Amino acid sequence: MDNHNSSHQLYKKAMALVLAGGRGSRLYNLTDTRAKPAVYFGGKFRIIDFALSNCLNSGIRRIGVVTQYKSHSLLRHLQRGWGFLRGELNEFIDLLPAQQRVDEEHWYRGTADAVYQNIDILRSYGPEYVIVLAGDHIYKMDYSIMLRDHAQSGYKCTVGCVEIAKEEAYAFGIMGIDENRKITSFIEKPKKNAPTIPGTTDRCYASMGIYIFNSDYLYDLLEEDITNKESSHDFGKDIIPRVVSENQALAHPFSMSCVPRCEGIEPYWRDVGTIDAFWEANLDLAANMPELNIYDKDWPVWTAQEQLPPVKFVPDRNGNHGVITNTLASGGCIVLGSEISKSLMFSKVRVLAGCKIDQCVIMPEVVVGENCRLKKVVIDKGCDIPAGMVIGEDPIEDAKNFYRTDKGVVLVTKKMIDELKEK
């Protein structure tokens, strides 16, 4: 395959399918009203924006987004923020909600079934390669490099993988590989004896939930899987182990295609599926030199852009000036004479006078009343925090009134605040 074909033409032969129908139950009340990919992240984005931005920046402009659980917020975001692709140039984002296309008795029953139920749509576009993506991880990756690796390998399936510590293997699909990167085993969330990377005893390759298939091979796998009554119709549990058994799976280490690719620096990839992981990944952005660069003009993260006035920091009525350090604030925010450190404020947040806020993630349209003290708190959209409230200092009170993790991060939602006001 010549360089021109490998670098320029392959992406035209591919279509991406972003799986965005999951609830994300480990995020507890954050997903009461929205799917996990629609959860806010990074001061102005939604989680799904990272996978979609990777597609666009990689040249992949034929995209389907598969939705199911509480999809209104996600669909509205995609319609408002991702409608700029040009259909006349064969660019599109197709929204694919569960609609019982092939089975009038079932909605999507698993990740593989979600793709199978849209198999007629995939076939109508005629891609040579199908890129299956999880819509709920935070990372920057050039899919065109992985696509080229897949096409040149001769394998029918390529699985994106990230290097992790062996003690974390219980939370991921773990693959064993040989010296040529052929996947020789695939174990979903092993409790012990996880296969390690050749040459190491304490590192494993975990699946990123990113798969590239030769399209005809994928269709055959899905049509066979759907007839298997023992199958859970899931890529990690059923499809990938089948591909491995047929010796058709190649491992693609994230370090080969991460953005940017820096020798000796571990690439940034986060599964933000728990409150602790979500909080930590958001606060990563408040570091002096964050590992994830959202200011990169060469690999921008796209999102819906609401027209808002600039953020404003002003003294309180007594002339006391606030102190703001290592904090990201989005458009429409107003802060009066308060101390805020290592935090993120999404759009239209109001912080009234005398507050002390540390290591907090504050989502859109939150009002923080006067003289509040907040530490290690995630505040969901639309909360009105009463004046004088203290959260994050008393573990017993926090656990009684809100959701508190074992690591001390406190989740606050509008429903929790309303119930507290009624007591």
UniProtKB/Swiss-Prot annotation:
Q: What EC number(s) are associated with this protein in UniProt?
A: 2.7.7.27
Say if the entry is tagged with keyword Lipoprotein. Answer: no
The record's listing under Pfam families reads: Hexapep_GlmU, NTP_transferase
Q: Kindly list the positions annotated as binding alpha-D-glucose 1-phosphate.
A: Y108, G173, E188, K189, S207
Q: In which pathway does it act?
A: Glycan biosynthesis; glycogen biosynthesis
- Catalytic activity of the protein: alpha-D-glucose 1-phosphate + ATP + H(+) = ADP-alpha-D-glucose + diphosphate
SUPFAM superfamilies linked to this entry: Nucleotide-diphospho-sugar transferases (SSF53448), Trimeric LpxA-like enzymes (SSF51161)
Kindly state which keywords UniProt assigns to this record, in alphabetical order.
ATP-binding, Carbohydrate metabolism, Glycogen biosynthesis, Glycogen metabolism, Nucleotide-binding, Nucleotidyltransferase, Transferase
State any GO BP term from the record.
glycogen biosynthetic process
Mind listing the GO molecular function terms for this protein? ATP binding; glucose-1-phosphate adenylyltransferase activity
Enzyme class, spelled out:
transferase
Under InterPro entries, the record lists: ADP-Glc_PPase, ADP_Glu_pyroP_CS, GlgC_bac, GlmU/GlgC-like_hexapep, NTP_transferase_dom, Nucleotide-diphossugar_trans, Trimer_LpxA-like_sf
Q: Do you know which PANTHER family this protein is assigned to?
A: GLUCOSE-1-PHOSPHATE ADENYLYLTRANSFERASE (PTHR43523:SF2), GLUCOSE-1-PHOSPHATE ADENYLYLTRANSFERASE-RELATED (PTHR43523)
State the function annotated in the UniProt record. Answer: Involved in the biosynthesis of ADP-glucose, a building block required for the elongation reactions to produce glycogen. Catalyzes the reaction between ATP and alpha-D-glucose 1-phosphate (G1P) to produce pyrophosphate and ADP-Glc.
Question: What quaternary structure, including any partners, is listed in this protein's UniProt entry?
Answer: Homotetramer.
Q: Which family does it belong to?
A: Belongs to the bacterial/plant glucose-1-phosphate adenylyltransferase family.
The name under which this protein is listed is Glucose-1-phosphate adenylyltransferase
